[in-house]
């Protein structure tokens, strides 16, 4: 039996089909991929074979670039290879670059990672796709997908994929991101000015001026205060300088409204005219306050009754508190004694005593100074006898001779001579009084110098330092203690009786109660103060301020 002859094309087709169906074919989707650091990427790879799938072995190999396609792209050698139609990044032997096995899988088994990729998150999925999680710096290179199928010896068993890792771009992005962050902070800093930024820092958006001007910062703080005081001002009426405890008063907000505390405490409350429609925003509140301050007439004179009460300037006592302190001057007359006609001084001495001396009120501050400064008091005691002797020598020239002769004889100084000086002003006053009555009033406020004996008595008795009365006027007065009277000679008593003033028949002068006790104090305390004032103020010829 003879087989029919087949035409030549059919014979060629039948010969080619078994060979084409039994060959191996590998394909890739992208031949070049770009990725950044720490990103994930999938390299696609597929194949066709006539062998069994469980016998197919898929292997991914890594080969580094011969020349870097990023950094060496603009070099002369790289451009010359491109002009010749070559690939300078991959056209080199394997001994000139690094070659590593990434992963390998047989059939449907689990992939096995290479030695250099054991700690990496790399796997093979689907038929031959390579998955790389967290791309590193050294993953930059060429990846080869190789398929090994038993029985298929023909065809193209591998394909290459270029993986370009933009590590340099990542570094640039990090630097640019930091610069953008700083720029953003600077812009926000300028936009928030002057509320939240620090002064004297120049921003990039406004380098010609300061970031925080002081005027804008003060305006912002003032607006904050006005917003905080706005709701309270809408509810309560405003009082001009009368409500000190209220926060709605305009006194602490404007320095021109500051007055004396004593004056403000007694001013009547005058409610100011308040508009009914208030603007809801903070700028309106500020404008309202400025308008009220402009309408306030500070130059308007006070009423006549207030002028009469507050015409005098503010004293030291009244400035310490809001209460008006009333001061009272109590003038005590001096102690007057007559002097015999044989002891009277000349007309020059008479004119010297008639010279008016400006009076200085003996106020509470001098008493406190004597109490708190004993050194000053001791200096006054040490200086007392010497200054008294000099004044006695000036007033009575004959006394210096008697004093010198008495010292040569060894006899002590008589108290009658020592007391003669204290009688001079009183006798002159007694002689001058009929023709010149005002002399008594002028002499009442003249301060007296303390005598040595009185200074010694006050040095021995420290209690008198707490008194508000001035020191004693002369050497030995009529109110000496009983011990001093016993030690005095009999002639002194007779002389004292002759030198008494006709105005005071008694030995002791009348006592003066010169204490104005503040109401509301304790009665026991008032009694003690009165007794001490009666004891000490009767010894004084000065003015006492209570």
From Swiss-Prot:
Covalent S-S links between cysteines: 45-145
Leader peptide range in chain numbering: 1-23
Cytoplasmic topological domain residue ranges: 189-546
Keywords of the record: Cell junction, Cell membrane, Cytoplasm, Disulfide bond, Immunoglobulin domain, Membrane, Nucleus, Phosphoprotein, Receptor, Signal, Tight junction, Transmembrane, Transmembrane helix
Pfam families registered for this protein in UniProt: LSR
Entry GO CC: bicellular tight junction; cytoplasm; nucleus; plasma membrane; tight junction; tricellular tight junction
GO biological process: epithelial structure maintenance; positive regulation of peptide hormone secretion; protein localization to tricellular tight junction; regulation of RNA splicing; response to fatty acid; tricellular tight junction assembly
Matching SMART domains: IG
Membrane topology: Single-pass type I membrane protein
A GO molecular function held by the record: high-density lipoprotein particle receptor activity
Membrane spanning stretches: 168-188
Source superkingdom: Eukaryota
Comp. bias intervals (Basic residues): 458-467
Function: Maintains epithelial barrier function by recruiting MARVELD2/tricellulin to tricellular tight junctions (tTJs). Crucial for normal hearing by maintaining the structural and functional integrity of tTJs, which are critical for the survival of auditory neurosensory HCs. Mediates fatty acids and lipoproteins-stimulated CCK/cholecystokinin secretion in the small intestine. In the inner ear, may regulate alternative pre-mRNA splicing via binding to TRA2A, TRA2B and SRSF1.
Subunit structure: Homooligomer. Interacts with MARVELD2 and OCLN; the interaction is required to recruit MARVELD2 to tricellular contacts. Interacts (via C-terminus) with TRA2A, TRA2B and SRSF1. Interacts with PLSCR1.
Family listed: Belongs to the immunoglobulin superfamily. LISCH7 family.
Protein name as catalogued: Immunoglobulin-like domain-containing receptor 1
Organism per entry: Pongo abelii
